[in-house]
Every structure is written in C-alpha cells, then in structure tokens.
Amino acid sequence: MKFVDEVTIDVTAGNGGAGCASFRREKFIPFGGPDGGNGGHGGNIFVVGDRNLNTLIDFRYIRRYTARNGEAGRGSDQFGAAGEDIVLRVPVGTIITDTETGEKIAELLVHDEKILLAKGGDGGFGNLHYKTSTNRAPRQKTPGWPGEVKNLKLELRVLADVGLLGMPNAGKSTLIAAISNARPKIADYPFTTLHPNLGVVRVGPSQSFVVADIPGLIEGASEGAGLGHRFLRHLQRTRVLLHMIDMAPFDDNVDPVAQAKAIVKELKKYDPALYEKPRWLVLNKLDMVPVEQRAALVKDFVKRMRWKGPVFEISALTREGCQGLIHAIYSHVASLQEQPEEVPDPRFTTNEDLSEAAPAPDRDDPRFR
C-alpha cells in the first residue's frame, strides 16, 4: 500500500432544515392553533483516530466530504429529522489544521478518540415555537442555519519512542529488522527505504517500545535534497534519536565523521527542537572491521566527532551488540514514562510551626468531655 502522510480535504457540514408554518385543521375545531414543527439539525463531520491505519491514502482519492442537510419541519407538530453524521477514520498521530486560519483543530493521539471537525447548522423554528399567550396564531418561521465549511490539512506523524537517523545505506532498515518483527525492504543501493517503517521491539512479556525508520538523509536535505526531509517530521514525537554511522563504507574516500556532521547540520537546519532531542551514536557494520582495529577506529571517530554522549558499537547484520542497545533504549524510555513526584503548591504551604500556632486542647475543658 502506498504511504501518504499529507493531504488536503474539504468538509461541509449539513445545513439545518427550515421551520414550518402551519395550523391545525380538523373538523369541529375552527381555531386549532399553530402546529408547525422545527427543522432538523444538519449532519456533523467527526474524525476518529484508528490505530489499525497507517496511511492517509484514502483521502487522496476522495477529497470532498459533505454531510446531509436536516429535514424541514412539517405540520401536526412534526419536527424534521437530523442529517446523518459523517465519521472520518484517520491513523493515530494525525494532526488536522484549518488551512485558512492556520489553527490546529485536532491532534489524535489515542485510539477511538473522536473530535468534531465541522458542526452542522441548527434547524429553523416553526410557528409552534412562537406561540405565546398573547400571540396565539403566529405565522413567522425561520430557515435553517448553514453548516460549517472548512478546508483542512491532514498531516500524519507516526508515534514512536525511538527514531533512526542516518545517511542512506547506514543500516537503519537492517537494524529495525534485526530487533523487531518489521520487514522493510533491504538492498545495497541508496534510498531503498521510501517511506517510514515502524517496528515494535519486545524486551519482555509486557515491556516494549516502538522504533521508526525513515529514508536516509543526505547533505542539503533541509533544502529539499533526497527524500529524508519529507519524513523528518515523523521523528518529532520520538523520545530518543539513534544516529547510525556506517563505519565501513564501500568508498574509501568517504569520511564517516564528515557524513555524521553533515547529518547533524541538516537536523539543526530543519528543526532546532528536533536537534535538541537526546541523540545516541550507533556505530554500525563493525563486523567488517578487523577486531584488532575496532578500538582504535572507534576512539578516533569519537575524538574527531567531539562526541560526549552515549556510543554503541554494533553490527545489525550479525546482531552483535544489539541486545545491549535494546536494553539501554528501554531503560531510557521507561525512565521518561515515570510520573514525576507532585510538587506542593507554594501558595498553600508555610514554614511556620503549626504545633505552636495551634496549642493542644485543655483536657479539663468541659467541651472536650
């Protein structure tokens, strides 16, 4: 299935039905009074988050959604039926924005969360509504109110705990296939990954985290080069980024340090907030480096990179070092999920000794007997 993570749609809620002006007409009842009912409410348009969806492709082919209008009121005190609502199902993690105002209408982060996108118009009043003790035969009625019309932008950002970052062919897809049940396409040419892939990593029976793999970045990605710039937004909800480095490039003229610095530069250009996220270095393909040269190669890389954060040495192909990386990631993610201790509100705290401010009651006082 084709991956689509951004679409624009038009939604039109239903108009309210018109009110009715009529009078009761029966034999032997010359002045039956008003009996015109109100119009029905126009149909609303809702959006619901669905964890079973992972693309917005359905909205690529159907871009206009119009709810039914409410029915008009009728005589004999009959109110019009409300228009049928429309419910749009989108992947969890979708952000919906009004293109005209720029206002963020909804951000669906929970399965089955339901949010109103466009409100249907209220039904008009029939003449029965205007009946009073002084106006017993009203003839006025009102039309229904129009429903809301909006042009909306739907943007999908995947929900993942960990994001994989790196140049093409750094081994990101190989890693996600090694540590999870995800099976992305893997090949020895650049840009094999064309869309984000998600994988669930099981650490224990009830312990897991989600990893997101996006297409590789190249220098100039923030200006539109390559594919990665289109998918960097999918890393904005992650808790930690794994910067994967190819330590054994095919071309001897390629400098892994220069490539790593280029990725960091592009990340900072694209989104400073994404640049500030916790980022770990994962030195991959060490199985292709002679054992006696590994320590010196890693030490030289870290020194030239001037890196102060965590460093992991792995081989995604042979899975060497992957278990240590998995447990480190889970410990980090679990620590962030713990709720912080409640901090008492300083407005309701005092440093005074309450034992002195409120002396103990006198036991001889008859009120306490």
UniProtKB/Swiss-Prot annotation:
A biological process from GO: ribosome biogenesis
Recorded GO MF terms: GTP binding; GTPase activity; magnesium ion binding
Compartments reported by the entry: Cytoplasm
Positions bound to Mg(2+): 173, 193
InterPro entries: G_OBG, GTP-bd, GTP-bd_Obg/CgtA, GTP1-OBG_CS, GTP1_OBG_dom, GTP1_OBG_dom_sf, OBG_GTPase, P-loop_NTPase
Record function comment: An essential GTPase which binds GTP, GDP and possibly (p)ppGpp with moderate affinity, with high nucleotide exchange rates and a fairly low GTP hydrolysis rate. Plays a role in control of the cell cycle, stress response, ribosome biogenesis and in those bacteria that undergo differentiation, in morphogenesis control.
Designated name of the protein: GTPase Obg
